[in-house]
């Protein structure tokens, strides 16, 4: 097995970002993705450059925070993205408004990186690909940029490089060392390239105001424990650059 340990939500908060950086530097996270519209996106890019983090993707976001483009089709009356299913089921979405926002998020990361950070894959926040318009935009831009993409239901039929398997069970009640141990035992002798989804990070007071998922520190410590116990010694750890 070749394993990408992917950390979602880089830039969502300072503490989450710091936790992901520590995980990458510690060798128990191999890749991450940035939420370009969030207040700590620039901080995340700075930390990626400072720590020479090479595998950074866009975590395309239409459901949390404010858009980078001024388009009321994407937002509520306060200029904030419609949340989760409300956005996915938004009857007012157009190809143009989604395309422009995704490109704006990519350009935001490029601007923050000042030529020192290049995106190497695409993921989406929440289940954006359940919307046909969003799915088409994600396909078109990912194809245009010749980047690999996360393997999820909506992208399974894309003629774009992606992992063979997407493992998302390491979450909530399954955030424990046995979950990781069983996962590695099941797949270690295969030739599959697998992405392990994670949402690691440190938790501070600000983070508690912007996310309901607070097991991030537990995920981080469990991944660290797996590294210390040698669970990853049985497999090959890679990042998204291997899928180019």
Show the residue positions of the predicted features:
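Active-site histidine-anchored catalytic micro-motif
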Residues: 126
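Terminal accessory/targeting
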Residues: 1-4, 14-57, 66-96, 100-116, ...
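Surface-exposed loop and adjacent secondary-structure segments within mature catalytic domains
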Residues: 61
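DG-centered beta-turn motif at the end of beta-strands
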Residues: 7-10
């Amino acid at each position: 097995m070749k394993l990408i340990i992917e950390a979602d939500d880089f830039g969502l908060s300072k503490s989450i970002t710091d936790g992901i950086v520590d995980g990458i530097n510690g060798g128990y996270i191999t890749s991450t993705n940035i939420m370009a519209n969030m207040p700590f996106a620039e901080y995340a890019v700075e930390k990626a450059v400072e720590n020479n983090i090479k595998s950074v993707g866009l975590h395309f976001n239409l459901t949390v925070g404010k858009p980078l483009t001024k388009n009321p089709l994407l937002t509520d009356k306060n200029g904030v993205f419609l949340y989760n299913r409300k956005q996915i089921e938004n009857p007012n979405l157009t190809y143009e408004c989604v395309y422009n926002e995704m490109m704006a998020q990519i350009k935001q990361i490029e601007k923050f990186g000042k030529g020192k950070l290049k995106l190497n894959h695409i993921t989406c926040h929440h289940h954006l690909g359940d919307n046909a318009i969003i799915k088409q935009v994600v396909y078109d831009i990912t194809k245009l940029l010749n980047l690999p993409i996360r393997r999820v239901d909506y992208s399974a039929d894309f003629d774009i490089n992606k992992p063979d398997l997407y493992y998302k069970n390491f979450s909530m009640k399954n955030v424990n060392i046995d979950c990781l141990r069983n996962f590695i035992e099941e797949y270690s002798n295969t030739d599959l390239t697998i992405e392990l989804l994670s949402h690691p990070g440190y938790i501070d007071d600000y983070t508690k105001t912007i996310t309901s998922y607070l097991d991030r520190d537990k995920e981080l410590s469990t991944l660290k424990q797996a590294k210390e116990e040698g669970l990853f010694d049985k497999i090959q750890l890679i990042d998204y650059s291997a899928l180019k």
